[in-house]
Amino acid sequence: MRVLAMGEVDTSYCPIWGYCEAEPSLDATLVVARDMHATTYGETGLRRIIRLYLPRNLQDMLEYDFILINQPVVQYFPPNSLQDIYLAVAEGGRGALCFMESQYSDIYGPWLETQLYDCFPYDHSKNLKLGAPGDKPFDLEIVRDANLPPLMTPYVPLGIENIKPFGEARPTFERPGATIFARCRTNAFSGAGVTNFPLFISWRYGPGNALVWVTADQFDTSMWRTNDGKERYALDIFTGFIWLSSGWELPDDPIRVHMMRDSFTHLRSRIGLVGNIIEFADSFGANTRQVQTKLGGLQLMDKEAGDLYLDHEFDLAESKMGEAFDLASEIEAESVALKERALTWVYLVEWLTVTSTAALSGVAIWSLMVKRRMFHPVSATRRVGD
């Protein structure tokens, strides 16, 4: 499934690209449309990215299965592209997810004037009445409702609600007719009488009957980035949004699927690491042809395992992943050996260079300063005219 993500989606701080790399069913296109966390694209750079990567017409927009909007600078978008996004959702039935409750009026103001805002099941005006507050820590409360798809409930026995704080959110309020999957509990806004508000909201929208989502926690907090090392099943939840919006059923054994996604994440990380080591060794003249061939085979095994996973052939996929991990270990050992041999020659050449330079310097000093072989006494002279 193709995912179009726009706004604050730079890979230096946003995990969306990593999610789509780890999950075999997802393929992402990023449209960075706001500078954040020390990025320095500038208006010219952002407009160029939008021009290059945002679909130029409705037909191209409909090539995507899911659209994610995370606080872009709406003013930088061509007006027709915003209308195309709206039509892709409202009439084309494409799923979508947004976080737009910025603290800055130049972000949320133009957004609220678009028709696209109407697609999403939250009431931004209630957030503004609180003064458009920033992120605050919250504890998670999952809605138990047998009529809802099991997006998060399978992780309750595993202690997902015991992670405190679960993330950092901004007060978000559902529109009438919306469905709430999880809630935030926090006393950070108790002065305004708000101690409980939705975390994930959804509804069906438009003639296309699109399943559309809102999150109260933007994509650079601990909930999504898991930067404290605690398992929040963020990849599983994110993938669940997209699968449900695309008409896919959630897995019957979500814990097994979670473990497989972890395996894909680790394997692809190792493939990237090995590739970097091989490239490093190659830059020093090492013969990397054989190990590169094996790396190509490893990448093929990763793809085959992904295809089996998508066909729900989990036993075969796990078996293929086991073979892939064995091959990855073999390639890692060979590539490290190549690197060490290449560096041995580098160190040897450096040692010989330093040693020869020191030897030549020593000979020169001995000759000039000790033996004084180049020394000649000054001859006596006489003055002209004597």
Task: Give the role of each language-model region.
Residues 1-66:
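Aromatic-Pro/Gly-enriched surface loop or interdomain linker
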Residues 98-186:
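An acidic, glycine-rich "communication" segment
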Residues 360-386:
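Juxtamembrane interface at the cytosolic side of transmembrane helices
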Residues 337-356:
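Juxtamembrane/start-of-transmembrane alpha-helix segments at the extracytoplasmic/lumenal side
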Residues 60-109, 207-209:
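Short alpha-beta junction capping motif
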Residues 300, 312-342:
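Juxtamembrane amphipathic/hinge helix adjacent to a transmembrane helix
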Residues 64, 94-95, 168-249:
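A glycine-centered loop/beta-turn motif at secondary-structure junctions
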Residues 250-301:
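Amphipathic, heptad-repeat alpha-helical segments
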